[in-house]
Amino acid sequence: MSHVDDGFRSLTLKRFPQTDDVNPLLAWEAADEYLLQQLDETEIRGPVLILNDTFGALSCALAEHSPYSIGDSYLSELGTRENLRHNGIAESSVTFLDSTADYPQAPGVVLIKVPKTLALLEQQLRALRKVVTAQTRIIAGAKARDIHTSTLELFEKVLGPTTTTLAWKKARLINCTFSHPQLPDAPQTLSWKLEDTGWTIHNHANVFSRTGLDIGARFFMQHLPENLDGEIVDLGCGNGVIGLSLLAKNPQAKVVFVDESPMAVDSSRLNVETNLPEAFERCEFMINNALSGVEPFRFNAVFCNPPFHQKHALTDNIAWEMFHHARRCLKINGELYIVANRHLDYFHKLKKIFGNCATIATNNKFVILKAVKQGRRR
């Protein structure tokens, strides 16, 4: 939990999911403060749009202006809602939209936390282009090291004249004025052929490894089991290539695709529809924080390529939560399969949670592990 005094109100903020007390990560950063400083004496007219507000620092500070919080992270939405409640602010003060929704017309102010991926930034800037005016104040912020020439060029190309500020507390801002530059349309997804399958994989802007199959997933696909039945889960599904492979290898099974990114879940749905339409009735698609709210003892198997970062921060908290959720939702003798970088040492984490862990395969970079739910051990 961390405290920020932003000139609008004094806030107490925490990350979601929370980090441990030994190595705490802040729920806000200098770029949030810097952005809010720019508005301290500015009269705000028209809708306020906030993009990629990681844990609600901006939304909480500007709640009296009824802002729209726009992003591609259900975890960020949950974190923002929790911080609103924690600071005594009505959740209804903020309207939440995902990045593929239509943005409100003629906003007075747009605040952007620059996302990790340039593709997501371009998608969001193109969406803003349809609604902003020359009078809209557009300000973006990030750590100075995360604002590159390519970032500034993208603002210039999509929206118009762009300048950057001096660094402050290692953060930097981007100021942009909309001038309606000429810009050709761009496809909503990036597509590529998946070798040895005949499948075409479609990827929305914020999908992990959207330009090609990542090497961890490729290794995982070589060792997926066959002849499973019942319900199985592609947890943290991304574009759904693991779930697609499971559908093809296990014609008696139903596959549940789960991710906290609406773009990932939409990509998975599109990839099943276009590549295995006959299997679509065996699928469920879920935007969720891991398996929160899912009934226990439901699944026969869970497959996971867990992230070890959240936005720009390195953390294993999300993976840890995924493992605990998987154990709760597996049937007795149900199996969790994961692929991970060898250096992360998930073997001992899984053994601590499940009481057992086995190595299925390994190479010089990745390891595939299996843990089995035995009895009712917590």
Curated annotation (Swiss-Prot):
Catalytic reactions on record: guanosine(1835) in 23S rRNA + S-adenosyl-L-methionine = N(2)-methylguanosine(1835) in 23S rRNA + S-adenosyl-L-homocysteine + H(+)
Gene3D superfamilies from the UniProt entry: Vaccinia Virus protein VP39 (3.40.50.150)
A GO cellular component annotation in the UniProt record: cytoplasm
UniProt keyword Methyltransferase present: yes
Enzyme class, spelled out: transferase
KW Methyltransferase (keyword) present: yes
Location(s) in or outside the cell: Cytoplasm
Record keywords: Cytoplasm, Methyltransferase, rRNA processing, S-adenosyl-L-methionine, Transferase
GO MF, any single term: 23S rRNA (guanine(1835)-N(2))-methyltransferase activity
Primary subcellular site in the record, as a coarse category: cytoplasm
Coiled coil: none
Pfam family, any one: MTS
InterPro entries: DNA_methylase_N6_adenine_CS, rRNA_m2G-MeTrfase_RlmG, RsmC/RlmG, SAM-dependent_MTases_sf, Small_mtfrase_dom
EC number: 2.1.1.174
NCBIfam families: PRK15001.1
Database matches in PANTHER family: RIBOSOMAL RNA LARGE SUBUNIT METHYLTRANSFERASE G (PTHR47816:SF5), RIBOSOMAL RNA SMALL SUBUNIT METHYLTRANSFERASE C (PTHR47816)
Its biological purpose: Specifically methylates the guanine in position 1835 (m2G1835) of 23S rRNA.
Family: Belongs to the methyltransferase superfamily. RlmG family.
Name of this protein: Ribosomal RNA large subunit methyltransferase G
Organism: Salmonella newport (strain SL254)
